[in-house]
Amino acid sequence: MSRHSQLKLAMPSVHGAPATAPGSPMNAKARSVKLGLGVNQRTGRVQWCPGLTCCKMLLLLPVVMLPLTLVLILIMRLDGMLAALQLNEQRMRDLRNSHSEVPVYMEDYEALLPEGSTYNDLINEEFILPASKRTQLQILAAERARRCQPYRYGNGESMELEERNTLMKDSRTSFLPLGIPRECLGSGIELDIKPIDEEAYQRQKKRYQDIAPYWLEKIRIRERREAERHAEEASAEISEATAALQSFWNEEGTREGIRMTQAKTMKRYMDNKVDPCVDFYKYACGNWERLHPIPKDKAGFDTFEMLRESLDLVLRNLLEKNTPVHSAAELRKSPVRNTLFKLNEQGEGEGEADQAAELTAERLRRHIVSKRQLLNRVLVRYKRYTNGTKRKRLIETPRERTKEEEAAPPVVLPKDKTKDKSDNEEQLHVPTDFLKPHQDAQLKAKNLYRSCVNSAVLAKRGLEPLHTLIRELGGWPVLESQWSESNFNWQVLAATLRRYNNDILIVQWVGADIKNSEENIVQFDQTGLGLPTREYFLQPSNAKYLQAYQRYMAEVMHKMGASKADAQRVASELVAFETQLAGITAPAEQRLNVTKLYKRMTLDQLQAVVPEIKWRAYLQSLQDREVLGTEEVVIYAVEYMSKLVTLLDETDPRTVSNYMMWRFVRHRINNVDDRFDDIKQSFYHALFGREESPQRWKVCIAQVNTNMGMAVGSMFVSRYFDNNSKRDTLRMTHDLQQAFRDILKTTDWLDDTTKQLAEEKVNAMSLKIGYPDFILNPSELNSKYAGIEIYPEKYFENTLNVLLHTAKTEQAKLHERVNKTNWQTAPAIVNAYYSRNKNQIMFPAGILQPPFYHRHFPKSLNFGGIGVVIGHELTHGFDDKGRLFDRNGNIHKWWTDSSIRGFDERARCIIAQYSNYTVEEVGIVLNGESTQGENIADNGGLRQAFHAYQRWLKEHPSEVSDEILPGLNMTGPQLFFLNFGQVWCGAMRPEAIRNKLNTAIHSPGRFRVIGTLSNSVDFAREFNCPLGSPMNPQKKCSVW
């Protein structure tokens, strides 16, 4: 049957009856047909797949297959993206390996350019870059163009067509959007860098060769400022203890708050897991190093350094604060200016007279001075005019008063009873000093600081000031091939450098004669060296330091202009020469007994002993006067002088000149810009372990405080110092003196004669606490620095002026009577001193701060802090050197032989005790011999301070309950010892420890605590330490 006949049979009848019976074979066949036309038995209609079987299958297949298909597509898509990312990462890794400094993104491209230029500037060839930089940028541009090509529609030059279409298709149809790198987003910048025409580059190179140094300098300044900013941010994050110190200077906080803060600080430093009877230093300071890691710009960090940091911040604020040109004291001089003074006192206008105003005033003053002759001529003409009869009559004849003036009450000016008529007439004229702000000592100190921190001016001036000075001194052979030895005389150069306060080859000064402390006399000694001690040159174990020193020399010379080969050759020669020089100096252990070194003679006698040196000519060049052969001098190194002239005769004059100039230039590079900082840092890292150079402002604070300490101290004392602390310290000093007298009476190894003389010496001690009074008197303070000219923009010349003034002032003391009331120590210093030839104790204002002292502290802390310091300095008058000087500061034998033997026996015990201590960090044993003076003072000071504290407790029984701190379960005596121990908390780098042990006369802080407390029966009693424990040994050493 044909298809048509089958179709016909399947059609329904006209009457709507079924064509076939339900049970017929035809019906069974129709149901079995899967895909085709058929009659739906229920409706009687012709349709595809009657019975819905096929439709169900058609619907089911897509529903099941579509999700599976989407999942497969997604997996394939992710695999493709992962492969592309891995390929991209590998390419970037390869690029970074071959160009490690090449950045990735646009802002990183611009980091390669000079400050102020952009990526477009490079494309337009407006800025010239080194070839290496241009190569890097070309590589970057090519790599970026390759990565970004898929996202740039229509461009397929750099890719295979199939690969580009595939990626572009993925980017348009993917279910997850394709991540576009941010450097490929539309930034308006053409991604393809134009090839740099080498010819154009060479043409532009000449055009911009003058601009390049400018850009490099700007980049260097920007980098330095960024480094300083980061350093300041780190410095700003000071510890709670340092913050408390700032609060102290600002007189902030209540009594209870201050005590609570101190208790919290002390608890933080302590390690309560350590038994105080085993190791009290670890018990008191166990957490110090964790809380105060050593700053990168320091070789060590201890309590003293923390206090100096706090004080430096205070001094910085004072020196950077703008000051009106005219001081308040000057403004007070006349009635008119009294008003200005009141405004000045109230602070109105403060900060408006900035540095520019000061400079303007200075220039105006100089302009007026330069026009002095013209002004005088004008004044003469004025006088002639007023002397004329008619004109004089016209000037002197008063005009008639108006009615209003007649009716007005008379004006009565305030009468100054202390002034006479002539004084009032003088007020009509501007005082001379009013036009000379440069005479103000405080302003000079501020200008010295400003000239030091002005990096822009220093960079602009470069090395020219230093080169000019070198030429004036006769030149530096390493820099001058034409240098001639015929014009060289080492004695003339040594005297000239001494005028700049530099002692090279010969040390000379004018000071009190140790055998006649009332007389100033010229004195000579052996030279110092370029490294801390002679052992650095002579001991093979110190070879690495000597190599670092030689490298330091060579790099400075090369930076100054010498060729690298010449610099290295000359540095080698100088190290060899200085090693010989070190060999002729006497070691420290041979110089302990100063009486054996002391030789007093006339210049004629000295000339006979060492005839090669023209002693009179040397001194005449320093004194600016004729010096006679009968002039008496003191010399401590006769043998050295004889060996020196022999060494110099055997040495090439060129080497001698190179060495002397090196020793001078080495210090002068500190007075130019920062170009030598990296060289110095490398050297000091090798010597002390310091990791970074200190910030420039810190260096400048130290320079100004060293060279103009009284001017800085006047600002500090006026603003911050509390005279109550001065009175408290003076009272405590008297208590400590009495404690020493009490101990002296119980000392059984001194005979009565020596005891009596020792007590007289204690009674005669001069006490200098806080500051000298003259610094608060502007005229006296100004006169001290009257001979120094300071310019706000000439740091190099300022330093030379200070050095010249210092040396001249010292030399001028010759033949003058010693003024024992004078202060030689700047007030803003964290230290204390004892002067043997003045029998004087000095406690500068800078040390009167926590943890040494606070007026709200319990007495236990003050006695354990500043009290121990007072006792320490007092005991220096009776240590191995101090005992040689009598009450007047003269050295002679005033002890009996039996008393000397008793002292020596006890001193040997101290020497042996400290010689048994080993510094574990470096494996070096302490030198008990060289540190005995300080160790004796430590032990004596602690005993006296505790004795004075116990006496105070007995005299103030009602205040015993107040001798505690909140949160610390300790008695007053225990707090005394704890504060003493924590004064010496600190840490040092290994290199710095080695240097300290080789040079210092103090024991490390750890042993100043352990050694002292293990000798104290008072400590053992207060902490209940069993006899025989490490901190309470059977054998104890004690001198005082």
Curated annotation (Swiss-Prot):
Residues that hold Zn(2+) according to the record: 872, 876, 934
Active-site residues, as the UniProt record annotates them: 873, 938 (proton donor)
A Gene Ontology BP annotation from the UniProt entry: protein processing
Reactions listed under catalytic activity: Preferential cleavage of polypeptides between hydrophobic residues, particularly with Phe or Tyr at P1'
Cellular-component GO terms for this entry: extracellular space; membrane; plasma membrane; sarcoplasmic reticulum
Stretches of the chain found on the membrane's Extracellular side: 77-1040
Single Gene Ontology MF annotation: endopeptidase activity
InterPro entries given in the database record: MetalloPept_cat_dom_sf, Peptidase_M13, Peptidase_M13_C, Peptidase_M13_dom_2, Peptidase_M13_N
Tissue: Expressed in the gonads and testes of adults, and the adult and larval brain (at protein level). In embryos, expressed in the pericardial, muscle founder and glia cells (at protein level). In stage 12 embryos, expressed in specific dorsal muscle founder cells such as DA1 and DO2, and also in the certain pericardial progenitor cells where expression persists throughout embryogenesis. Expressed in the glia cells of the embryonic, larval and adult central nervous system. Expressed in the somatic muscles of larvae, pupae and adults. Isoform A: Detected in the male abdomen (at protein level).
Domain of life the protein comes from: Eukaryota
Transmembrane segments annotated in the record for this chain: 56-76
Disruption phenotype: RNAi-mediated knockdown females lay fewer eggs and display a reduced hatch rate when mated to wild-type males. Wild-type females mated to males that undergo RNAi-mediated knockdown, lay the same number of eggs and have a similar hatch rate to those mated to wild-type males. RNAi-mediated knockdown in the dorsal paired medial neurons impairs middle-term (MTM) and long-term memory (LTM), but has no effect on normal aversion learning and anesthesia-resistant memory (ARM). RNAi-mediated knockdown in all mushroom body neurons has no effect on learning, ARM and LTM.
Outcome of swapping residue 873 to Q: No effect on its function in maintaining muscle integrity
Region (Disordered): 1-27
Cofactor requirement: Zn(2+)
pH dependence: Optimum pH is 7.
Note accompanying the cofactor annotation: Binds 1 zinc ion per subunit.
Root EC class: hydrolase
UniProt region (Required for maintaining muscle integrity), positions on chain: 1-45
Keyword Secreted (UniProt): no
Known EC number: 3.4.24.11
Membership in a protein family: Belongs to the peptidase M13 family.
Role: Metalloendoprotease which cleaves peptides at the amino side of hydrophobic residues - such as the hormones Akh and Dh31, and the neuropeptides Allatostatins (AST1, AST2, AST3 and AST4), Crz, Drosulfakinins (DSK-I and DSK-II), Lk, sNPF and the tachykinin peptides TK-1, TK-2, TK-4 and TK-5. Functions in female fertility, memory formation and may also act in regulating insulin signaling and food intake.
Protein name: Neprilysin-4
Organism: Drosophila melanogaster (Fruit fly)
UniProt gene name: Nep4
